[in-house]
Amino acid sequence: MVKQELIDRSPVRFLEKATNGGLQAGEIGILTSKKGLGKTSVLVQIGLDMLFQDKNVVHVSFNQQSDFVMTWYEDIFTEMAKKKNLTDASDVKADIVRKRVILNFNQDAFSASHVIKTLKALAEGGIKTDGLIIDGLETDKLNETAAAEFKSYAKEAGTI
């Protein structure tokens, strides 16, 4: 199987269909549930789907070490590659790692403007963010102002 088939058969296609084409640049989506129900797994699958489409992804984690998130990407990619008999899996994996940035922020010191400042610094350094995943941010920290800041950044940067 080639990478395009992974894109075509991704569960993200069902999400896109259910949401009339999925998120577009400048839009944000919020996924919430109780702790331990698989949000990170879903977000990593969304991230992998974007990476398979040669998009640059920044995964911001608030509740785990960066290596934990990297392990999620590794495990899900490995399982997909095995189940789908992905040709050139090591080349695809190397390409994914090059296009992915994982950042870790402290939940207690959360500031949307601090995260956005970091994303802008990455862009100034040549690391464009096509897709932004924010994982583990407690819902009481994501107030209307913070959500508006992220939406404004997404629109300005052309980020999903």
Which role fits each region the language model picked out?
Residues 1-3:
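Charged, amphipathic alpha-helical linker segments immediately N-terminal to NTP-binding catalytic cores
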Residues 21-23, 49-52, 94-97, 123-127, ...:
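Conserved catalytic network of the ASCE P-loop NTPase/AAA+ motor domain
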Residues 24-29, 55:
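Pre-Walker A (Motif I) flank of P-loop NTPase domains
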Residues 35:
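The conserved Walker
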Residues 41-107:
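Conserved P-loop
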Residues 100-159:
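Phosphate-binding/switch loop-helix module in NTP-utilizing enzymes
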